[in-house]
């Protein structure tokens, strides 16, 4: 019905429109326009918009009027509202969509937890970024310091002044001392208070090295590691903050390994003796730990007036086992409460502390150990750990029983210390590996771990093959220990560099001596560990043990290991040479030579032939290096003689060997062009003819240089002539000169005078004394240029020395120049020209300068 009415309305509207269109007459003023319905609608909307723009609603006008009355700018308010931002409310974030308070609170809780987690993540990221930035800055600073240190390695030693270096005097120490400072050690250390650590170390170590060389020269005993340790202690360096190992601990270890603190056990190999020494060092350290623990807990220790070793162990156990109840050695009435059996604890800690006799007494007195374990322990103590194969097998079987008991009834059914003790006596690699796998928490410190391993080590090279074949046991060797320790990077031991000496300490304990030294030498820093490394090498080489500890994978020979140490010591000594301290250079160079010679044995000549040869070769090479320095000859040889008054006599006491060395050094200097030093050495050993020959060679070259215009040629020639005359003077008063030497000296003196005559001719020519120069030329032998004398054959000129012959071409040029400047009154000038021409014609094979032949041709 409604649709019919709507359609009728549209129909009426269309009819009315048609009538209007028919009534409208066309106008000439306005052209007819055709529009469809869509166009009409668009035009109508546009027209309506124009009318609405100019018509403000009454509400808008009223609002503007109200704002104006209150003093508010409507336009400014509109602009502000455009930039206004609505903030979300709590209800917006947590819409109340839940139907109960509990659900709503649960939703709020979850959202709060999510927000907290997100904030924590942001804090973690920010903290991580800050930490990484700090680490990068520290690494950058460290790399910069290491780079600067590598650029100025020689600055590790301060500059020194040369001091009178006569034998027995103190020449140029690392720290220059003023004349007012006393030479007592106490006052010297006072003057070094403000010096850097590396300078202090270098000074006190150098004093020990000087004393070492002096003692070894005289064949006196010398505890080198002990004195190095004492020198380090005297510095009172406090570098132990946050560090478990310092240099003093390393020196104490070396004392123990070298046997300076206790007698070395006989009947074992040198390598096994080092193992025992390292183990004794750990035992001594544990003894100090026990005393510190007792002093920290005096009430619980209840030591009283007892000072025996066993009483100390029991006092320590009272503290350690205080939570276990009454201990057997303190129990009064065992029937009331069964005490804790500490037999195995006492034995273990007695051995751990080095109280072997007390450990044996406990084992023999206890019912749980006296029958089976006591004999095994006695043999282990007596043999130094090298028990018989049957003993090792028995101990290994007991280990198997204990392990099976633990698997069946639980590991708490027996004392773990009992298992460790039987494993130590067995020395079985299989048992040790199982303990490392199943009971890795038994060892509280790395010292405890290494002591256990060192106690298990057997001297495999000393006859372990029979043990393996007969009983099927594979003994634990030092190589096994080294291979296990080397699985971990150095940073694992040093805590990423925070405790830098732990790694070399572990290497030394595992008898990896050379790797320990090399690692320390590469430690650049203010602590001066590279200086310590050099002196550790000196100590180990002196005891002839460095080659025993090349480390796993570095099977070096004795010479290779000692050569590594020698190179390090030599490089360190060259730093003193760089600063002009010849005295300390000599001391360290002597140690470098001794290193390749086998250490202490090289001083007494007890090392093998090859080592002695290597030692002599290096010593001569290093002494030659010192001789080449300024004042080196005076330092080694003294004011006169061939070394009796200088330092050379200390290391080459035999006069024949000393003279032979100096002659060889002079020959090397001559080949290197160091003629002054070569002449001085030849003069010192009485080789006057050789010295004169060197002077004649240099004088011949100097004359040629003088003719060619060298500015210092004249002073050079005068100095050589004076040196030659000085040698001839010394020769006259020398007591022991052979007939052959006298003949050779006379020959060289003749050559010197001939060269001196040639030199005088050049001087006369420069002074324009041409006639005098010509007369001197006519007097020269071998040339026979005097026109009044008969001609000679060319063979006579061959008899002249090579030094004389070298000067002849320049001499003939000067002679021709002089002839051109002198009037020929009697034909003698022309006669001399003819003589010169004939002389040149007979020596055309010598390839003399072309301008000489041209000059003689022009003169005719």
Swiss-Prot record:
GO cellular component: nuclear envelope; nuclear pore
Keywords annotated in UniProt: mRNA transport, Nuclear pore complex, Nucleus, Protein transport, Translocation, Transport
Protein localization: Nucleus envelope; Nucleus, Nuclear pore complex
Keyword Coiled coil applies: no
Gene Ontology biological process: mRNA transport; protein transport
GO molecular function: structural constituent of nuclear pore
Transport listed as a keyword: yes
Self-association state and partner proteins as the record states: Part of the nuclear pore complex (NPC). The NPC has an eight-fold symmetrical structure comprising a central transport channel and two rings, the cytoplasmic and nuclear rings, to which eight filaments are attached. The cytoplasmic filaments have loose ends, while the nuclear filaments are joined in a distal ring, forming a nuclear basket. NPCs are highly dynamic in configuration and composition, and can be devided in 3 subcomplexes, the NUP62 subcomplex, the NUP107-160 subcomplex and the NUP93 subcomplex, containing approximately 30 different nucleoporin proteins.
Family the entry assigns: Belongs to the nucleoporin interacting component (NIC) family.
Protein name: Nuclear pore complex protein NUP93B
Protein's organism: Arabidopsis thaliana (Mouse-ear cress)
Gene that encodes it: NUP93B
């Amino acid at each position: 019905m409604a649709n019919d009415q709507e359609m009728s309305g549209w129909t009426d509207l269309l009819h009315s429109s048609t009538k209007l269109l028919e009534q409208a007459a066309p106008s000439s003023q306005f052209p007819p326009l055709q529009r469809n319905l869509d166009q009409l609608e668009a035009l109508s909307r546009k027209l309506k918009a124009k009318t609405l723009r100019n018509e403000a609603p009454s509400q808008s006008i009223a609002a503007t009027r109200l704002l104006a009355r209150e003093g508010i700018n409507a336009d400014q308010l509109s602009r502000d509202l455009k930039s206004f931002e609505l903030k979300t409310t709590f209800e917006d974030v947590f819409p109340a969509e839940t139907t109960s308070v509990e659900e709503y609170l649960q939703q709020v809780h979850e959202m709060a937890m999510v927000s907290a987690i997100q904030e924590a993540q942001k804090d973690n990221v920010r903290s991580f970024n800050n930490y990484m930035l700090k680490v990068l800055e520290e690494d950058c600073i460290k790399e910069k310091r290491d780079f600067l240190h590598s650029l100025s390695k020689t600055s590790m030693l301060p500059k020194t002044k040369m001091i009178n270096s006569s034998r027995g005097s103190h020449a140029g120490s690392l720290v220059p001392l003023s004349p007012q400072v006393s030479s007592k050690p106490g006052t010297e250390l006072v003057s070094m208070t403000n010096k850097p650590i590396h300078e202090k170390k270098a000074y006190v170590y150098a004093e020990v090295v000087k004393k070492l060389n002096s003692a070894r020269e005289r064949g006196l005993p010398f505890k080198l590691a002990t004195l190095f340790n004492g020198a380090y202690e005297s510095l009172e360096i406090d570098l132990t903050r946050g560090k478990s190992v310092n240099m003093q601990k390393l020196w104490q270890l070396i004392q123990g390994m070298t046997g300076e603190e206790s007698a070395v056990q006989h009947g074992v190999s040198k390598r096994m003796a080092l193992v025992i020494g390292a183990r004794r060092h750990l035992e001594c350290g544990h003894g100090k730990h026990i005393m510190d623990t007792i002093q920290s807990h005096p009430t619980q220790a209840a030591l009283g007036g007892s000072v025996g070793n066993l009483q100390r162990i029991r006092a320590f156990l009272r503290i350690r086992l205080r939570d276990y109840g009454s201990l057997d050695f303190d129990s009064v009435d065992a029937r009331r409460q069964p005490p804790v059996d500490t037999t195995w604890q006492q034995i273990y800690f007695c051995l751990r502390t080095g109280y072997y006799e007390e450990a044996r007494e406990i084992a023999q007195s206890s019912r749980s150990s006296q029958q089976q374990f006591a004999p095994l322990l006695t043999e282990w103590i007596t043999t130094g750990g090298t028990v018989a194969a049957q003993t090792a097998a028995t101990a290994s079987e007991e280990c198997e029983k204990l392990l099976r008991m633990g698997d069946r009834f639980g590991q708490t059914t027996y004392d773990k210390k009992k298992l460790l003790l039987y494993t130590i006596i067995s020395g079985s690699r299989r048992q040790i590996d199982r303990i490392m796998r199943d009971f890795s928490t038994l060892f509280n410190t790395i010292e405890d771990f290494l002591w256990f391993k060192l106690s298990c080590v057997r001297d495999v090279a000393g006859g372990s093959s029979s043990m393996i074949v007969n009983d099927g046991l594979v003994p634990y060797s030092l190589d096994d220990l080294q291979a296990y320790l080397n699985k971990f990077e150095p940073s694992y031991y040093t805590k990423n560099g925070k405790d830098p000496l732990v790694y070399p300490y572990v290497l030394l304990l595992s008898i990896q001596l050379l790797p320990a030294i090399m690692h320390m030498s590469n430690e650049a820093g203010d602590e001066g560990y590279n200086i310590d490394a050099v002196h550790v090498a000196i100590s180990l080489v002196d005891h002839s043990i460095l080659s025993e500890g090349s480390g796993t994978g570095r099977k070096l020979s004795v010479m290779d290991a000692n050569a590594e140490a020698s190179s390090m010591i030599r490089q360190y000594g060259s730093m003193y040479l760089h600063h002009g301290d010849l005295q300390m250079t000599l001391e360290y160079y002597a140690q470098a030579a001794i290193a390749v010679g086998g250490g202490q044995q090289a001083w007494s000549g007890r090392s093998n032939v090859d080592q002695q040869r290597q030692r002599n070769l290096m010593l001569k090479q290093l002494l030659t290096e010192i001789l080449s320095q300024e004042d080196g000859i005076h330092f080694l040889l003294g004011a006169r003689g061939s070394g009796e008054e200088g330092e050379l006599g200390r290391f080459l006491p035999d006069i024949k060997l000393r003279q032979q060395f100096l002659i060889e050094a002079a020959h090397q200097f001559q080949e290197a062009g160091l003629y002054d030093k070569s002449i001085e050495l030849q003069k010192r050993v009485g080789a006057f003819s050789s010295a004169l020959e060197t002077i004649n060679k240099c004088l011949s070259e100097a004359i040629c240089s003088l003719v060619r215009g060298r500015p210092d040629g004249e002073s050079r020639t005068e100095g050589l002539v004076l040196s030659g005359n000085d040698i001839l003077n010394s020769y006259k008063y020398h007591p022991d000169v052979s007939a052959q030497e006298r003949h050779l000296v006379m020959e060289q003196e003749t050559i010197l005078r001939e060269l001196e005559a040639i030199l005088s001719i050049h001087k006369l020519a420069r002074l324009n004394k041409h006639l005098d120069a010509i007369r001197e030329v006519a007097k020269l032998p071998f040339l026979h240029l005097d026109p009044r004398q008969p001609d000679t054959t060319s063979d006579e000129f061959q008899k002249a020395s090579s030094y004389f012959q070298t000067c002849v071409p320049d001499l003939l040029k000067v002679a021709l120049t002089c002839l051109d400047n002198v009037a020929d009154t009697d034909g003698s000038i022309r006669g001399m020209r003819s003589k010169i021409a004939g002389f040149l014609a007979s020596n055309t094979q010598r390839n003399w300068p072309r301008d000489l032949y041209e000059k003689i041709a022009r003169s005719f």
